């Protein structure tokens, strides 16, 4: 929702009023929705499944963020699954797959997930990965 050109070819989308690909209406929608939910003070948690490098997903709208409580760390999931596929002997040469996330882990309020996307549409079970 954040990008006007996501999943589209050239000519299939129209730039915003500033000439870029940000979906300004979607950005304002998320900011407003998350402000309302956070304002209720009932302990609701709002989690973004956002796989791009969009900045400030978990910052408050007052800080020009989208206002989500947490963001999935899709990079960690990918690296973790790749690491686990390796023969245990070769893992010692690939520990960077498990430690790379430390370089950006404080940029957002991340949660570590194993996505349902990894097992749907005739993909194998998580245990077989």
Describe the residue ranges of each PLM region.
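Short acidic catalytic loops
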Residues: 1-2
């Amino acid at each position: 929702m954040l990008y006007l050109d996501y999943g589209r070819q050239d000519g299939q989308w129209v730039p915003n009023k500033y000439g870029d690909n940000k979906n300004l209406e979607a950005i304002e929608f998320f900011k407003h929705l998350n402000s309302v939910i956070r304002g209720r003070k009932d302990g609701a948690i709002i989690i973004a499944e956002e796989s791009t490098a969009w900045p400030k997903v978990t910052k408050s709208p007052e800080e020009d963020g989208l206002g989500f409580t947490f963001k999935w760390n899709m990079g960690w999931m990918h690296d973790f699954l790749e690491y686990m596929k390796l023969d245990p002997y070769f893992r010692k040469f690939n520990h960077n797959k498990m430690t790379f996330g430390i370089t950006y882990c404080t940029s957002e309020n991340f949660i570590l997930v194993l996505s349902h996307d990894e097992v749907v549409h005739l993909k194998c079970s998580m245990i077989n990965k």
